[in-house]
Amino acid sequence: MSNIPTELKYASSHEWIRKEEDGSYTVGITEHAQELLGDMVFVELPEVGDTVTAGNDCAVAESVKAASDIYAPISGEVIAVNEALEDSPELVNSDAYGEGWFFRVMPSDESEVDALLDAEGYQAVIDEE
């Protein structure tokens, strides 16, 4: 069974967010998602300064099995990207909730966070797959 940290919020499309001290949110894909995809070989990230919209694709994760769109769980401006993934995309596999994060977003509408799933709700999504 996948690890689903309770302090994070989740999108049904298998992204997670974590609130940071500056009010921004770090975004990544869940352990469940990386298990489905398999070994990462390339990650295409948005650019710093890009505006992302909740539910729209904004990044791509390519694995030995498939290329998968990554969707923005919330809307806002991208303020940082995980440049370490350019050389080490396998960080997504080894540390999905830590060093394998994708980007950080300053939210334009924080109420979107409330629409995301808690750990229990995300587990229910996985169970239905």
From Swiss-Prot:
One of its GO terms (biological process) is glycine decarboxylation via glycine cleavage system. Binds 1 lipoyl cofactor covalently. The gene is gcvH. Residues 24-106 form the Lipoyl-binding domain. NCBIfam families: gcvH (TIGR00527), PRK01202.1 (NF002270). The lineage of its organism: Bacteria, Pseudomonadati, Pseudomonadota, Gammaproteobacteria, Alteromonadales. HAMAP family: GcvH. Its cofactor is (R)-lipoate. InterPro entries: 2-oxoA_DH_lipoyl-BS, Biotin_lipoyl, GCV_H, GCV_H/Fam206, GCV_H_sub, Single_hybrid_motif. Transmembrane segments: none annotated. The modification N6-lipoyllysine is found at K65. Belongs to the GcvH family. Keywords: Lipoyl. It comes from the Bacteria. The glycine cleavage system is composed of four proteins: P, T, L and H. GO terms for cellular component: cytosol; glycine cleavage complex. It comes from Shewanella sp. (strain MR-7). Pfam families: GCV_H. The glycine cleavage system catalyzes the degradation of glycine. The H protein shuttles the methylamine group of glycine from the P protein to the T protein. This is Glycine cleavage system H protein. CDD domains: GCS_H.
